[in-house]
């Protein structure tokens, strides 16, 4: 396996990087930052399509790409345990979810137009935690992002207990190492192409996460949290980083049986480790 770095907007560079590749794993995606919508789209959408086309030109057998649980959207009729057959209906305001869902649709169209390959593998991870996970380190926008790591790592060691609002909503977490194992199985396993849900076993709540971090949860009823999140999500001129509040409006809990059966994948990290290593430290 070889890691290659480059600009996904540069088609020539992508073709050079994909030359003679048997499988291409593409993870580049802009999640936070101050870039314009046009710049973000040029990386997230056009850049990923460029990568797929370069892989096809190189004769790669497989193209593995990371989508997200957010592609399902956060809707009141979401069942607990959505399978990969559940429709992709992204959140109304969250650009990240909208672009992941659009990307799935466009990649499927590209793959259908090329019956000889590459075969398309789409992973839909839940909330990813770990020392290198972007979402765990960039909860605050722009120059404030480094504060997240410091606050999380020090809060549990303060002499005065810190209370944190903890909505009583079900959550799924997955450790970055388990996502890495799923990506590897997409590369080497015999499982068929398509979408795969990736999440740790079991369902927890925000209060569980808060306690594992050494903080004191201040319970918030699920109904109140959902109402507040829905109200905030509809506010005009909501900045991109604040759009994530829509994820708290309704749960999105996935079934991972297909990945376990078809890919031979299983999460190895317990919930306690997933919670305790969001920004480094084990």
Task: For the regions a language model picked out, list residue spans one by one.
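Short-chain dehydrogenase/reductase
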Residues: 39-42, 81-82, 92-104, 137, ...
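NAD(P)-dependent short-chain dehydrogenase/reductase
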Residues: 118-170
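Active-site Tyr-X1-5-Lys
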Residues: 92-124, 131
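Conserved Rossmann-fold NAD(P)-dependent oxidoreductase catalytic core, especially the SDR/UDP-sugar
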Residues: 46, 50-96
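Amphipathic terminal alpha-helices
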Residues: 258-261, 269-282
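NAD(P)H-binding glycine-rich loop region in Rossmannoid oxidoreductase-like domains
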Residues: 5-46, 54, 73-74
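Mid/C-terminal beta-alpha module of Rossmann-like enzyme folds, strongest
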Residues: 180-240, 256, 276-277
